[in-house]
Amino acid sequence: MEIVSEDVAWQNFERLAAFIFEKNDFRVTVNTVKTDHKKRRQYDIIARRSNQTFLVECKKWAGSRNRLSALKKAVEQHTERTAFYNTITREDAIPLLVTLVEEEIQCYEGVPLVPVLRLNAFIHELDKDADRNSFRDYEDDMDIPDDVPWPEKE
């Protein structure tokens, strides 16, 4: 599946992630735009089931030397988009990045980075645990190499 994912356009990569959510009984919208006071944010996937909403950012990057730095920036931007969404909808949506390949990190600043091949298993694990706060614990338990180029927070 990873080889197939590499060859598809990014829009189809998003549809694959949306399909996995749909197969797990989520109501899914793709490429949704929300606006408020002239601010505009786009969401690759919004997946809802019961009282749970995921805001999914799909990143189909592979082989980049600066991929880890780019992922960190993507997490920061997606965290801001999630805060915007939560403010205008009064929901408590969960940010999630879906990647093409397994990354050196699995969670950054409480945001899971899940390879598309493991998305179904990730959803099933959430069904068992049903605790979004475990993302932070998951991050704290990780052994992140010292040479990972994460710039300091400002």
Each model region followed by its residue ranges:
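Intrinsically disordered, low-complexity Ser/Thr/Pro/Gly-rich regulatory segments
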Residues: 1-154
